[in-house]
Amino acid sequence: MDISKLTDVKKVDLCKKYFLIGACFLPLVWIVNTFWFFSDAFCKPINAHRRQIRKYVIASIVGSIFWIIVLSAWEIFFQHYRAQGLVWTDFLTFVFPTGRV
């Protein structure tokens, strides 16, 4: 999809839709939103529509960073306790070590 051919109003609408879709626990959509609209939000001269795009891009960046931190912390926490051989970690995994099943 070539977003350079869209009008500013349609860009704002598309950026808003991607932000709302990302708010449904889909952080990868926020990352796509950031990459697609970053140049419109920060590299081109500012106007009323680009100000709205900038708002959604900044919110997408903040949301993506939040989810990356949360998922990384969970992975570190889980792997740390799984290496200790605690029983509850086996209930949270789909991949069982050899000899455990």
Curated annotation (Swiss-Prot):
Highest taxon above the source species: Eukaryota
Disulfide bonds: none
GO biological process: cell fate commitment; embryo development ending in birth or egg hatching; embryonic morphogenesis; germ cell development; nematode pharynx development; Notch receptor processing; Notch signaling pathway
Any Pfam family: PEN-2
Ranges in a coiled coil: none
Entry membrane topology: Multi-pass membrane protein
Tissue: Expressed from 100-cell stage in most somatic tissues, including neurons, muscle, intestine and developing vulva. Little or not expressed in early embryos.
Keyword entries, A-Z: Endoplasmic reticulum, Golgi apparatus, Membrane, Notch signaling pathway, Transmembrane, Transmembrane helix
Lumenal side: 1-17, 79-101
TM stretches of this protein: 18-38, 58-78
Ranges of the Cytoplasmic topological domain: 39-57
GO cellular component terms, A-Z: endoplasmic reticulum membrane; gamma-secretase complex; Golgi membrane; membrane
Chief localisation class: endoplasmic reticulum
Compartments in which it is found: Endoplasmic reticulum membrane; Golgi apparatus membrane
Subunit architecture: Component of the gamma-secretase complex, a complex probably composed of the presenilin homodimer (sel-12, hop-1 or spe-4), nicastrin (aph-2), aph-1 and pen-2.
Family according to the record: Belongs to the PEN-2 family.
Function: Essential subunit of the gamma-secretase complex, an endoprotease complex that catalyzes the intramembrane cleavage of integral membrane proteins such as Notch (glp-1 or lin-12). It may represent a stabilizing cofactor for the presenilin homodimer that promotes the formation of a stable complex.
Full protein name: Gamma-secretase subunit pen-2
